[in-house]
């Protein structure tokens, strides 16, 4: 299992963005980006399945901006369900992407999965962040959609997930 990753993406942060980033403690980063033809594969892991899902959501948002520049000014909740763990992960990420792209332009600094009901495949989560603003947050690459292509959920001793996102 990989260790916590250091964010090496260069966003050419302004002094104001660096100041916001320094204002809050860094959020644990247990994810990486894997090369994939024309898309990006997210690989996230955690001590629990909940943490692996959280990290996958943060990997998705981390591809769109430096989440360290986001201030936890608002709270957004997402509840979703699926037919199995893969569809639950898909709908979880899709709902968070909707909060960003179509609904509130909400970008989280942190996402926390409050519970996963693995019997009925339901999930409750919460995120702390703010409305995305180009004047405040560096622009990464837009995530257009979540895909089922090569999606994997390993719910074992060291849970990990793999998801391809369409960019």
Swiss-Prot record:
Belongs to the archease family. The modification N-acetylalanine is found at residue 2. This is Protein archease. Component of the tRNA-splicing ligase complex. InterPro entries: Archease, Archease_dom, Archease_dom_sf. It comes from Homo sapiens. The keyword Metal-binding applies. The gene is ZBTB8OS. One of its GO terms (molecular function) is metal ion binding.
